[in-house]
Structure formats: structure tokens, C-alpha cells
Amino acid sequence: MDKKITIAQIKEVAQQAYDLYKTNTDGKNADYIPYLANINKNLFGISICLLNGQTIEVGDSEYRFGIESVSKVHTAILVLRQYGAKELLEKIGADATGLPFNSIIAILLENDHPSTPLVNAGAITACSMVKPVGDSKQKWDAIVANITDLCGSAPQLIDELYKSESATNFNNRSIAWLLKNYNRIYDDPDMSLDLYTRQCSLGITAKQLSVAAATVANLGLNPVTKKQVFDAELSPKITSMISTVGFYEHTGDWLYTSGIPAKTGVGGGVMGVLPGQFGISAFAPPIDQAGNSVKAQLAIKYVMNKLGLNVFNGHRVTIVD
């Protein structure tokens, strides 16, 4: 079935979503990371990046917030770029754990691999794999350059967030050294954890994340900069991982109700990929008990359902002026 949607319709629906949910008071800021606890809880932004490079923005789409776990997608892409899909599967894996994002039990249950680069254990392993192994500065430069390629503009380290996370990341320290015990980390554990903590502390905007999502939706071609960031055949690999674990143990419910693969972070950001159509991101600091932004979820679901879009419905969708 063919379906046409106008850019005006997308703008209208995005504005409706913003107006509908901007006063929602459900959820609360992440309180286990001091910096995040103090962010203005009323911030709310939506951005959609079309594959022609046009962005549709509503609300606080240019506010720079902590990227947190959404960064796992970016570093997974970097590992895919440097090693290829086969080696990522062998060294990390692509299975959903069905457990919370910071689970230590998942490592004990599947000690032969960390399961997926989109949970903490796999993301720390991914940071350990980033080349050149053994050189923290060059690894960090590669991580930032990759995010810049995907987003079309550079992120900025939020130093206060980095210090806040570094002082409270006891669980992740346990994960890093447990991975070492099972020979599933490929560089110094403390260095790898520090890189992971730093990448989670990068400041990003909803607009930047929508461009990154559109780059994935556009088979690795950044629609804004026109740069081929990664090989087209890697796009289904990363999208499939987002589909299965983007919302951790609640991914099934999310995909069932929204129809779009998306990755979430406790900083309040959600980044969704609709292959061949657009990237969408929403941001609002209050999160639910699973660590997912309440308003960002509601907004993206509204846009998808109101426009009748779903990654599984088989429609041939054309977006027109």
C-alpha cells in the first residue's frame, strides 16, 4: 500500500505532540546522578530530520543535555566501522538480555559474551575495542569524531556531568572488572570505563540526535552534511540491535505501541530510526522507573501513530512538500 505524507503534516503533528504533552508532570529526573537531578524538569523538545536534510523542530530542540546511553548506538557504529559486523557479533554479541541496562547478572548468565553493545556491559566492551587499543586520547578522539560525523556537528563534554558520573559509577566499575574476569574486555578496564563514562557525559541536542538517527535511516549517508559515514550494509545491523534492546527490558512494549526502533537514555533523550524515512528525537528530563523519558516517549508515539507510520506495516511511504 502506498502512502503519501506532506512535510506540513509532519510539522503539524510534531507541534500537536508538543502542545499535548508539554504540561505532563509524570516521572522525575534521574536522582542517582547529581547533575541530572538538577536539570530543569520542564525542558521539552522534539526534532525530526528528513532524508533531504530538512529538520522540523519544536520546543527545546537546541538545548544541550547529557547523551547518556543513547551514545551506545554511536559507539556500536564506530566498532562496526572499525571491525565489521562479524567481529562485533563474535566479541560482543547482539542479543537482548531482557534485564535492566546496568545488570551484572546478565554477565554471569552469559559469561561467554556481553550480549549487546546497547547495554552497559557491551558498551564498556565496545569502548575497549575502539582503535587504537591502548591509547586513551586517540580512542577518545575517534569516539568524538564518529559522533560528530553522525550528528553533523560536534558534541561538547559536560564536565560537571562527567565528574558527577565518575564519582558514582560503582556498578559500572564492577561490570568492567567482571568482564576482565571473563576475558570479554579488550583494553585496560579502568581506561575503558572512563571512556564510556566520558561518552555518556557528552552534551547533545535533540536536533543533533535526529540527524544521527536520519543518518542510520539513510543507510549511513548523513542527510545534512552529505557525508557517507558508514557502509550502507551496516545500517540494518545497528537498526536491528536498536529494535531488540533500545528500551532494555521494555523494548517489546515500546515497539508494539510506537512502531519505531528507538534508543533511550537517562538524560531524557530518545532517538528513533524509521528506515528510509526519517530520524526523530525527543528530550525531556523526567524519566519513568525504567529510566526512559516520559514525555519523549509520549511525543514520539504520538507522531508515529498520528501519521500512521510503523516499521512493520509494509507501507511504501513517500514524504512530499
Curated annotation (Swiss-Prot):
Alphabetically ordered keywords of this record: Hydrolase
Reactions the enzyme catalyzes: L-glutamine + H2O = L-glutamate + NH4(+)
EC number: 3.5.1.2
Organism: Parabacteroides distasonis (strain ATCC 8503 / DSM 20701 / CIP 104284 / JCM 5825 / NCTC 11152)
Gene Ontology annotations of biological process type: glutamate biosynthetic process; glutamine catabolic process
InterPro entries xrefs: Beta-lactam/transpept-like, Glutaminase
Annotated protein name in UniProt: Glutaminase
Family: Belongs to the glutaminase family.
Gene3D superfamilies documented for this protein: DD-peptidase/beta-lactamase superfamily
Chain sites annotated for binding substrate: S69, N120, E165, N172, Y196, Y248, V266
Recorded GO MF terms: glutaminase activity
Subunit text: Homotetramer.
Pfam families (alphabetical): Glutaminase (PF04960)
